[in-house]
Amino acid sequence: NVCHGSDSVESANKEIDLWFK
């Protein structure tokens, strides 16, 4: 998330989805 600067939206959304699940 914070580490990712370029793909903060796409990567974050996918990572967040996994965290929520």
From Swiss-Prot:
Keywords: ATP-binding, Cytoplasm, Kinase, Magnesium, Metal-binding, Nucleotide metabolism, Nucleotide-binding, Phosphoprotein, Transferase. It is an enzyme of class 2 (transferase). Its cofactor is Mg(2+). It is found in: Cytoplasm. Its main location: cytoplasm. Its EC number is 2.7.4.6. The keyword Transcription does not apply. PROSITE patterns: NDPK, NDPK_LIKE. Gene3D superfamilies: Nucleoside diphosphate kinase-like domain (3.30.70.141). GO terms for cellular component: cytoplasm. One of its GO terms (biological process) is nucleotide metabolic process. It comes from the Eukaryota. GO terms for molecular function: ATP binding; metal ion binding; nucleoside diphosphate kinase activity. It catalyses: a 2'-deoxyribonucleoside 5'-diphosphate + ATP = a 2'-deoxyribonucleoside 5'-triphosphate + ADP; a ribonucleoside 5'-diphosphate + ATP = a ribonucleoside 5'-triphosphate + ADP. The active site is at residue 4. Major role in the synthesis of nucleoside triphosphates other than ATP. The ATP gamma phosphate is transferred to the NDP beta phosphate via a ping-pong mechanism, using a phosphorylated active-site intermediate. Homohexamer. Belongs to the NDK family. This is Nucleoside diphosphate kinase. The lineage of its organism: Eukaryota, Fungi, Dikarya, Ascomycota, Saccharomycotina.
